[in-house]
A protein has these predicted regions:
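Alpha-helical transmembrane segments of multi-pass membrane proteins
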Residues: 14-17, 86-91
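Alpha-helical transmembrane segments
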Residues: 3-18
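Juxtamembrane boundary at the C-terminal end of a transmembrane helix
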Residues: 123-132
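Core segments of transmembrane alpha-helices
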Residues: 54-67, 119-120
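Cytosolic, membrane-interface loops and tails of multi-pass inner-membrane proteins
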Residues: 20-51
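Interfacial loop-to-transmembrane junctions
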Residues: 93-118
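Physicochemical signature of membrane-embedded alpha-helices that form the seven-helix bundle of GPCRs
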Residues: 7-10, 50-53, 83-86, 111-114
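Short alpha-helical packing/oligomerization segments
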Residues: 66-89
Length: 132
């Protein structure tokens, strides 16, 4: 369970970073001290930050549930670390591309590719475990 716990903590911490970015762009009193006087927020920038945050929330829970189930059924710890590292790198790339950059093509595509590779690795492992 330690592999899942570690990556759940890392992904949760990154989720908070992305959430604070959204709060900042919305002009929340929580992040008011970060605002520059006369700062104008681009609505597209806010929308992208919201999607960067939302996208992590859409993928991470399913990944972590599948990860925990595999870990509890005795999957290789090395394999789980590899899948989690790939998935987490993808989520970081995608989240940064969406939430902090205006032009993000390569980072965004690379992020989704790594996200899918990590998730597909777990899916295949789960199916093989069921079939064996």
């Amino acid at each position: 369970m330690e592999v899942t716990l570690l990556f759940a903590a890392i992904l949760s911490a990154f989720m908070i970073v992305l959430a604070v970015r959204v709060l900042d762009l919305r002009g929340s009193p929580v992040t008011k001290s970060f605002h520059r006087p006369g700062r104008v927020i681009d609505p597209l920038e806010l929308e992208r930050a919201i999607r960067g945050h939302g996208n992590l929330i859409e993928y991470a829970p399913l990944f972590l549930i599948l990860m925990l189930l595999l870990e509890l059924t005795g999957a290789s710890e090395t394999f789980l670390y590899i899948c989690c590292t790939v998935f987490t790198a993808g989520r970081f790339m995608h989240g940064i591309a969406f939430s902090f950059m205006k032009k993000n093509g390569l980072l965004r595509i690379g992020g989704m590719t790594l996200t899918f590779l990590g998730l597909i690795g777990l899916i295949i492992s789960a199916l093989l475990k069921i079939l064996s």
